[in-house]
């Protein structure tokens, strides 16, 4: 009883600390609000101009998928006054992040059970370099955090006949908020085959329905030439170089540290690519050797291990062929980086080899430290986090109230505006 009270108190303190870190990164956004790009110019503008039904079922065919949470955020924000609308949208974007921390800390999971690793995973999600300013507190990129949340949901320990309706709602919203979560469908399928609980069955059915719906939207957008022409392209060597830098390198070293190493050692792209490939092959070979030697460890954990590998490679393939142009950094690199970091954490948990455990903990702490350094003021894109000569929202609303044809200035400024007439 006393142990349980102490354990709960630790979780409450950690949750509060995470909230403080979130507020530290962007106090201006959380106190004043801001619309980021299409969050305002498309999704909120739809709700403002066309009402509930149009906004709820709106599909941006140029992107090729339904983004339900962005639609819902625009609708709810429109219920409030125009001065409060961006603030409401920002707090709605915070919802999946808080749910992620709640599930990590308070839910029984096959993925992580000990408090110290729950703490480490929370810090990795919040502070590591993949949590770039581009995806911070805006509804259009909440799909990334809903995918992470869905991945946590699938590894919940479920009773045979109990149903958690919150989990079903999360899967439904996540599945209709972009295509990332739909990629996890095979994991939901094999989780059901493995445990055969009622919860896993309904999770699978809901995500299957979402995946089919999103697939139909993608096919329709592509066949009718509504899909942005830069999407669904072939993979070339320059894209691979870009991917290697933005995912495995930056996930652990961050932008500043990786560029410091490359520039000071005068390493060219081709040589860096060669070194990373060799290092990856050595790590893979060692893991194969280790698991063959410790078959019982692999057998106990192969479902989670294979799920992490599948998620990493499938999401990586998706961003490589579905990203815009020859760039897979920023928001595109977030999920592959998350799965790679989580794989490293999971291996650190299950291995009994001291040298491997030390190495994995070291690269995870480097990821946290490099991400913490870039978390706010040392970030190249800090204008996405803090107000630096940003438009005053109250003044923008007053200008719009005087002239309904005025284009309201939103973030990223000064190039983005929002039309509400």
Give the predicted meaning of each segment.
Residues 123-130, 175-176, 209-219, 310-321, ...:
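Aromatic-anchored segments of alpha-helical transmembrane domains
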Residues 24, 80, 127, 142, ...:
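Transmembrane helix irregularities
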Residues 183-209:
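Perimembrane helix-loop-helix junctions
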Residues 2-127, 161-162, 190-191, 203-204, ...:
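Intrinsically disordered, polar/acidic, low-complexity terminal segments
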Residues 96, 103-107, 115-158, 176-177, ...:
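Membrane-interface micro-motifs in multi-pass membrane enzymes
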Residues 291-325:
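Acidic, Mg2+-coordinating catalytic modules of nucleic-acid enzymes
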Residues 152, 164-190:
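Membrane-interface alpha helices of multi-pass inner-membrane proteins
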Residues 153-157, 184-192, 282-287, 337-353:
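Transmembrane alpha-helices and membrane-interface helical segments
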């Amino acid at each position: 009883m006393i142990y349980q009270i102490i354990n709960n108190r630790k979780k409450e303190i950690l949750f509060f600390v995470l909230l403080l870190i979130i507020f530290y990164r962007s106090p201006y956004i959380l106190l004043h609000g801001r619309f980021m790009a299409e969050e305002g110019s498309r999704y909120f503008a739809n709700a403002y101009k066309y009402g509930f039904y149009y906004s709820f079922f709106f599909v941006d065919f140029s992107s090729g998928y339904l983004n339900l949470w962005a639609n819902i955020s625009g609708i709810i924000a429109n219920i409030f006054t125009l001065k409060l609308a961006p603030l409401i949208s920002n707090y709605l974007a915070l919802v999946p992040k808080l749910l992620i921390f709640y599930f990590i800390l308070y839910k029984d999971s096959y993925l992580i059970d000990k408090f110290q690793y729950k703490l480490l995973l929370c810090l990795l999600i919040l502070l590591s370099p993949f949590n770039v300013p581009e995806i911070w507190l805006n509804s259009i990129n909440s799909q990334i955090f809903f995918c992470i949340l869905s991945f946590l949901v699938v590894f919940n320990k479920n009773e045979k006949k109990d149903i958690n309706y919150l989990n079903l709602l999360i899967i439904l919203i996540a599945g209709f908020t972009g295509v990332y979560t739909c990629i996890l469908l095979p994991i939901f399928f094999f989780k059901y085959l493995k445990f055969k609980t009622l919860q896993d069955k309904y999770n699978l059915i809901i995500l299957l329905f979402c995946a089919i719906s999103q697939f139909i939207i993608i096919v329709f957008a592509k066949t009718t030439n509504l899909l942005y022409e830069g999407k669904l392209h072939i993979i070339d060597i320059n894209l691979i170089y870009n991917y290697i830098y933005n995912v495995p390198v930056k996930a652990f070293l961050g932008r500043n540290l990786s560029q410091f190493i490359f520039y000071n050692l005068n390493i060219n792209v081709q040589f860096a690519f060669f070194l990373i490939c060799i290092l990856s092959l050595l790590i893979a070979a060692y893991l194969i050797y280790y698991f063959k030697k410790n078959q019982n460890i692999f057998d106990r954990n192969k479902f989670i291990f294979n799920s992490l590998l599948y998620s990493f490679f499938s999401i990586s393939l998706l961003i490589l062929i579905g990203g815009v142009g020859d760039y897979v950094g920023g928001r595109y690199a977030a999920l592959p980086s998350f799965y790679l970091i989580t794989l490293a954490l999971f291996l650190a948990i299950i291995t009994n080899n001291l040298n491997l455990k030390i190495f994995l903990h070291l690269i995870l702490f480097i990821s946290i430290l490099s991400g913490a350094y870039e978390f706010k003021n040392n970030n190249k894109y800090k204008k996405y986090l803090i107000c630096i000569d940003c438009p005053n929202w109250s003044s923008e609303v007053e200008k719009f109230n005087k002239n309904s044809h005025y284009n309201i200035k939103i973030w990223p400024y000064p190039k983005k505006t929002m039309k509400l007439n």
